Amino acid sequence: MSKRQKEFHDSLANEKTRVRLYKSGKNWVKSGIKEIEMFKIMGLPFISHSLVSQDNQSISKKITGYGLKTTAVIGGAFTVNMLHDQQAFAASDAPLTSELNTQSETVGNQNSTTIEASTSTTDSTSVTKNSSSEQTSNSDTVSSEKSENVTSTTNSTSNQQEKLTSTSESTSPKNTTSSSDTKSVTSISSTDQQTNTSTNQSTASNTTSQSTTPASANLNKTSTTSTSTAPIKLRTFSRLAMSTFASAATTSAVTANTITVNKDNLKQYMTTSGNATYDQSTGIVTLTQDAYSQKGAITLGTRIDSNKSFHFSGKVNLGNKYEGNGNGGDGIGFAFSPGVLGETGLNGAAVGIGGLSNAFGFKLDTYHNTSKPNAAAKANADPSNVAGGGAFGAFVTTDSYGVATTYTSSSAADNAAKLKVQPTNNTFQDFDINYNGDTKVMTVTYAGQTWTRNISDWIAKSGTTNFSLSMTASTGGATNLQQVQFGTFEYTESAVTQVRYVDVTTGKDIIPPKTYSGNVDQVVTIDNQQSALTAKGYNYTSVDSSYASTYNDTNKTVKMTNAGQSVTYYFTDVKAPTVTVGNQTIEVGKTMNPIVLTTTDNGTGTVTNTVTGLPSGLSYDSATNSIIGTPTKIGQSTVTVVSTDQANNKSTTTFTINVVDTTAPTVTPIGDQSSEVYSPISPIKIATQDNSGNAVTNTVTGLPSGLTFDSTNNTISGTPTNIGTSTITIVSTDASGNKTTTTFKYEVTRNSMSDSVSTSGSTQQSQSVSTSKADSQSASTSTSGSIVVSTSASTSKSTSVSLSDSVSASKSLSTSESNSVSSSTSTSLVNSQSVSSSMSGSVSKSTSLSDSISNSSSTEKSESLSTSTSDSLRTSTSLSDSVSMSTSGSLSKSQSLSTSTSDSASTSQSVSDSTSNSISTSESLSESASTSDSISISNSIANSQSASTSKSDSQSTSISLSTSDSKSMSTSESLSDSTSTSDSVSGSLSIATSQSVSTSSSDSMSTSEMISDSMSTSGSLAASDSKSMSVSSSMSTSQSGSTSESLSDSISTSDSDSKSLSLSTSQSGSTSTSTSTSSSVRTSESQSTSGSMSASQFDSTSISTSFSDSTSDSKSASTASSESISQSVSTSTSGSTSGSTSTSTSESLSMSGSDSTSVSDSTSMSESDSTSVSMSQDKSDSTSISDSESVSTSTSMSLSTSDSTSTSESLSTSMSGSQSISDSTSTSMSNSTSMSNSTSTSMSGSTSTSESNSMHPSDSMSMHHTHSTSTSRSSSEATTSTSESQSTLSATSEVTKHNGTPAQSEKRLPDTGDSIKQNGLLGGVMTLLVGLGLMKRKKKKDENDQDDSQA
């Protein structure tokens, strides 16, 4: 043996005499050397050692066994320490172990010890909770006394995982009585290791021990008291057997298996049969339903040791019927039988007890058997003291034949008695069976009513101390619902052998333990489960049968004994664990559902998993054995799991985790937006987010013009240029191709800035055929001389919107040569309705100076006889209302130099006889009313020859755009008295400025009949110098009604040479009917050079939005035919000089209508070479941005056929009073007939190319490009006229303007649509420049005239 073991052996040999004294505080205490030596070898495992026992200080026997682990020894020693009543420790020499203080006195010196006799009572309570061990404690204490020696031996065994038996020997000089009362709580649980502590005390001591282990289920209470008077020397041997396996998988002797049955584990220990059912939730066993001929029972699976106490606590329901109250039956019997496990008695009168040999028990009977039933019933008649109706309770015994007898006694304690609480309403009543194994007294309590009896005689009669238990109920001809509700049932098993199957590595049960039960001395074959466990991956290692002395390993049998036995089989785990997990697909950026690694292991230990290769963002949680987290990167990863069990068996499992992105990116919603045109917008941020964390690509479509998308910053910005509402679509795409589409609306509203670019193209074809035939006869005599003063008052209401202004200056040099011969007679009636819509705007200033030299030659044959003298004064008032809408406003200022040469040949013959020298005063009162519906017939013969030379200079600037639609109704009444004589030479200079807004559409029908007699003598020389400037910008629709009243009274004598200067300004709304026939031959070559200077200052605001798309192609065909016949007879005699006053009132009602069909096909070609030099100084505060696109295509075809016939009747009544002095009388009669047929064919071709460039040093930029091609060919001859012309004009204009201060350029008016343009300055400047040009032109002409006269 080892050195330490030898020292331990020696310490045991000298245990009685060797003590150690040491000081604890002020006191001296003693400690056995055994304790000190034992702890010298603590923690050293050993396989076997010998304990030598020696009589009178010698040890003669060596025993071997298994040792305990170091932790078990420490636990045992600690418990010993607790069980010894410590008294004191020296402050300077604290002992390593507890002090074996056996009621010792304080030692005053080191030489004497006094020990007194005492009585020892030991109460031991052990509490364990839910561990994997079973603990059964049987404590037997034998105490022997003699005057000199007392030896106390305690045998304690338990089926813990460790085995601990202690052996002690001691001597006490006095009598001792030892009493032990041990209470322990234990059960089956899953704790790996436990420490069981057994305490043996041989000297008379008073010790209380309480040990707590982590388990609790069963309560074992053992009370043992014994005394002895003979001197006895007892020795118990402790087998410190330590397992050689890694864990202390121990077996314990099952000498006292205390079982607690409750509703939760009832099925583990008890079995139902027959009609019985069990409800675990309530713990109720229903033995019979409320039905006939039923039997149900519940039996205990193991035997009850009658030497140990047992206790049943619960409730019983006997139903709601009993004898005398519905004849209920049969009752419930509780039987204790020495027979076979699971055996039950008969039903009926036997109440589950009869039929069992040498059994005993207690019954609750609801049916009284007054007479003895038949022999097969195995029951005698019930006693008479419980007859007369009502349920009763009583003890019952059976004989060897199984015939049951209801026990009666003279003592009320155990005599049969009726129940104080009869069954009602299926109510549960408390029921309790309490048996004391020491006194053999059984006490039964039902609803507070008690029966008590000592059943030791029945136990002796049965021939055994081990009994099976059954609870039985039945019904026959009477019924009842009969139930037992379990509370707890505590008992001690007997004649059982427990077999465990333990993992050698972990020390845990591989499969639940099996309990074999039977009768004492019965041989039972047990199964080591080797085949089944091999299939589970275990190899058989060894068996421990140290607590089953009757075990035969060869035959695998065990012989049952009163004491419980235990056999343990050990197995080694050789199978690696497995992990079940499938390939996974998860979404990036989202917290995943945990991937649980389902680990399966045949072993009882824990499995450790090592996980590698996880995707970014994931981790392994060993506590839950799952993979958790949020993946952050897309891709596929191979994950490896290495699983290792406690036996170091390993397995490797791989699977894939594919991180994908199937979620489309999210876009922060963008609400509908709006802004003003030409106003920069605040950037619109497109906020996107993707679960992958990667960048998102945005594609934006449907942006309004002027806005752009910046993909770098994901913003929409810019300046919108078009008014309107757009739907913007955003398509957001992540790296995986997932798309999200978002839309919102963007509205661009009006602002003070706009852009316009206009492109228009027009093609027009026109063809006209006109045929006219006229017969006219006329005789006329007239003398007239007139001065007309006309006053016109016009009121016009107009609405005008102008969308563009432009300023242009040009200087042109034009040379024109023309030769023309024309002769035409035509009558045509044309009714034209035209609707034109144009969106254009220009403002131009132009000054033109033109010189023209014209030579003309004409031949004319004319015969006329006329004498006329007339003076008249006319005053008219006109009122017109018009509404116009204009899209064009223009101001032109131009200066041009033009030279024209015209050759004309004219032949005229004239016969005139006129004598007029008169002074006349005439008063005339005329009243006329006319109604006409006539056909006019006219016959005239005229022969005229005339020779004339004409020279004219003209300067004209006219811009006119007009569309008019008017209807007029007029009534005119005229009263006139006039006398006139005229022989005049007149020269006139007129400056006319007209602004007209006209839209005309007229329907007319006229009927006239004319009778005239006139005589006129006239001689005239006309020189005309005319300069006119016309500015017209009009688009009007007018309806007018006019009433004209005229009153004139005049006396005039004229023989005058007059010059006339007239300045007229007209604003008119007109209704027009046109009749035209034309035939021309024209060849034009022009070259113009113009120079201009302009100064302008204007403020303007232009809001222009132009959208135009038109194509024009028109064809028209017109055929007009008219026939007119008129006859006229006029006789006039007048005095030569007259003063005339006339008052004229006229009312006229005129309705006209015209229809026309025009076919025109013309081609014009023009060639021009123009050089323009322009100097311009502008001061402008306006900014106008115009961008307009216009494509115009128009196709029209019209066919018109007009036939007209007019009939006129006129009735005139005239009253006049006149006073005249006249020296001449003239009578003229004339008949003329004229018939003219003409045919004219005209073809013209011209080519015109014009290109103009201008530069303005201002804030404005203007660019014009014009290309024109014109070809004209013309030939004509008298008679029938056919005209074809075709022209093509293409113009492209682009204007860009800037307006800086729109607020100053336009004043807002109420919503009338009117707009005030501050262009008065421009008008004044224009007028000034025109005046200067005219004065310069006049001065130049005068100089030329002076040069001619000097020449």
Swiss-Prot record:
Proteolytically cleaved by a metalloprotease. Glycosylated. It is probable that most of the Ser residues in SSR1 and SSR2 are O-GlcNAcylated. Sequential glycosylation by sugar transferases are able to generate complex sugar polymorphisms. Keywords: Cell adhesion, Cell wall, Glycoprotein, Peptidoglycan-anchor, Secreted, Signal, Virulence. It comes from the Bacteria. It is found in: Secreted, Cell wall. PROSITE patterns: GRAM_POS_ANCHORING. It is a peptidoglycan-anchor. The keyword Signal applies. Residues 100-228, 751-1323 are annotated as: Disordered. CDD domains: lectin_L-type (cd01951). GO terms for cellular component: extracellular region; membrane. Residues 100-111 have a biased composition (Polar residues). Gene3D superfamilies: 2.60.120.200, Immunoglobulins (2.60.40.10), Putative peptidoglycan bound protein (lpxtg motif) (3.10.20.320). Residues 90-230, 752-1312 are annotated as: Serine-rich repeat region 1, SRR1. Pfam families: Gram_pos_anchor (PF00746), KxYKxGKxW_sig (PF19258), Lectin_L-type_dom (PF18483). Residues 1-89 form the signal peptide. Mediates binding to human platelets, possibly through a receptor-ligand interaction. Probably associated with virulence in endovascular infection. This is Serine-rich adhesin for platelets. It comes from Staphylococcus aureus (strain MRSA252).
